[in-house]
């Protein structure tokens, strides 16, 4: 996806770019995760990229749990738009 489409997904009623918002960070982490996953399918022994992927997954998980605590409705909407699974602990 393109960065402008991420911004439109996040804040359709808000027309300004808010790159510090939790939703924007989750979307950008999801984009990085998808790129790293496709990279690791070709390069299975790239252990530094695997480590980076695990770190980004942890950051995204922490942000998702924060968003779920603060606003459950936005959490559900974001998960459905990004086609990612809901957290097991929720």
From Swiss-Prot:
Its main location: plastid. Gene3D superfamilies: S15/NS1, RNA-binding. GO terms for molecular function: structural constituent of ribosome. Keywords: Chloroplast, Plastid, Ribonucleoprotein, Ribosomal protein. GO terms for cellular component: chloroplast; ribonucleoprotein complex; ribosome. One of its GO terms (biological process) is translation. It is found in: Plastid, Chloroplast. InterPro entries: Ribosomal_uS15, Ribosomal_uS15_bac-type, uS15_NS1_RNA-bd_sf. Part of the 30S ribosomal subunit. Belongs to the universal ribosomal protein uS15 family. This is Small ribosomal subunit protein uS15c.
